[in-house]
Amino acid sequence: MAPKRSSDLFSQVVNSGPGSFLARQLGVPQPETLRRYRAGEPPLTGSLLIGGAGRVVEPLRAALEKDYDLVGNNLGGRWADSFGGLVFDATGITEPAGLKGLHEFFTPVLRNLGRCGRVVVVGGTPEAAASTNERIAQRALEGFTRSLGKELRRGATTALVYLSPDAKPAATGLESTMRFLLSAKSAYVDGQVFSVGADDSTPPADWEKPLDGKVAIVTGAARGIGATIAEVFARDGAHVVAIDVESAAENLAETASKVGGTALWLDVTADDAVDKISEHLRDHHGGKADILVNNAGITRDKLLANMDDARWDAVLAVNLLAPLRLTEGLVGNGSIGEGGRVIGLSSIAGIAGNRGQTNYATTKAGMIGITQALAPGLAAKGITINAVAPGFIETQMTAAIPLATREVGRRLNSLLQGGQPVDVAEAIAYFASPASNAVTGNVIRVCGQAMIGA
């Protein structure tokens, strides 16, 4: 799916010829046009350097050598290459003094990181460290990657991946996460921390079609982010069951037709919602679905002192109670079983809060609660659950924000711009992949490393 053109007038102006010149003269930060996924294009625009002395250097090289231009590590050399990605394996750092390795690896090569480059640090889960000093050193990696993300320019991003120390030497569960981060699919994911468990993974037959043959339920699919999720899922090979309320029937039918899926008119807050979805699955898909995306959501903004019961209750019902009921119901009746994927839509408002949105922020923080509370029990059934928390995304809702507020909101992140619905959809598709079976309980922001929140 081709990326949509940005509706951000400021970015269009300062990236134009005359506008770019004027912006440089005035010292105005210039948002980079982010490189997003296009079928057939290489994952990175330059070579990939993998360094460090940890346990995943060689497994990563073996997993990625077919699709990436790998180069060797030469810490003392001068580089003529423009790197597309830099990966540092920090799993071998067991003492705080060993953090010097970060400086030694990155400092000589950072200036050679190309436009929209990727920086990924792989560490070990701090809570599972073998010693106090190792735990301290591994926890320190988060401050490094978040700070580096705020230093990089030209659309480059950082990420930290914590790998379970119980992962087998081949670390196959790490591959899907690394492929996502080292690609244009993660264009608006910056400064985030991913946790990968010990489970092994089997790569898909085709990394371009990782969802081939899967059945995906997407609520709130008539328009906006939900419709884009459906498009990305279909691109990746899934059959989409697109769900929305009957008042959105025309848009829902358009979405379903566009992606070759099926439309189901349904109020997710209805008492019989689980039964109707299960019936649809029995009639069309042998009673089973592989993926559930709890995307449906509404806003009813008001200062709490002025908020009536109707506004509070409606947001709670759609955004929090319905996702919990659907998840527990569809897992409980076997519609989603072993190998299943559940992904919830949280929001940066649920992390940082937002004035006038106590109801909305409560539900989006609650979505994080659903993810973290259900993850252990679902893992025992072979099901993963993760959440995506979008920041400022260019949608009809954000387009209605007053101009001055909208422009400020767009700039308050390391990438100096708003994201696109496809950025959210790509993160959800990564979580939905069968190869992401070692990834559960994560809450990942798609926010360009927003300055607010954690």
UniProtKB/Swiss-Prot annotation:
Q: What EC number(s) does this enzyme carry?
A: 1.1.1.212
Binding sites annotated in the UniProt record for substrate? 302-306, 354
So where's the catalytic machinery, residue-wise?
360
Q: Which residues bind NAD(+)?
A: 223-225, 244, 267-268, 295-297, 360, 364, 395
As one GO molecular function, the record gives: 3-oxoacyl-[acyl-carrier-protein] reductase (NADH) activity
A GO BP entry: fatty acid metabolic process
Q: Which UniProt keywords apply?
A: Fatty acid metabolism, Lipid metabolism, NAD, Oxidoreductase
Q: Does the keyword DNA damage apply?
A: no
The miscellaneous annotation reads:
Restores respiratory growth of S.cerevisiae oar1 deletion mutant.
Q: What protein family does this chain belong to?
A: Belongs to the short-chain dehydrogenases/reductases (SDR) family.
**What binding partners and quaternary form does the record give?**
Homodimer.
Function of the molecule: Catalyzes the NADH-dependent reduction of beta-ketoacyl derivatives. Can accept the beta-oxo fatty acyl group covalently linked with CoA or ACP for catalysis. Highly specific for NADH. Could be involved in fatty acid biosynthesis.
Query: What is this protein's name?
Result: 3-oxoacyl-[acyl-carrier-protein] reductase [NADH]
Which gene is transcribed and translated to give this protein?
Answer: fabG4
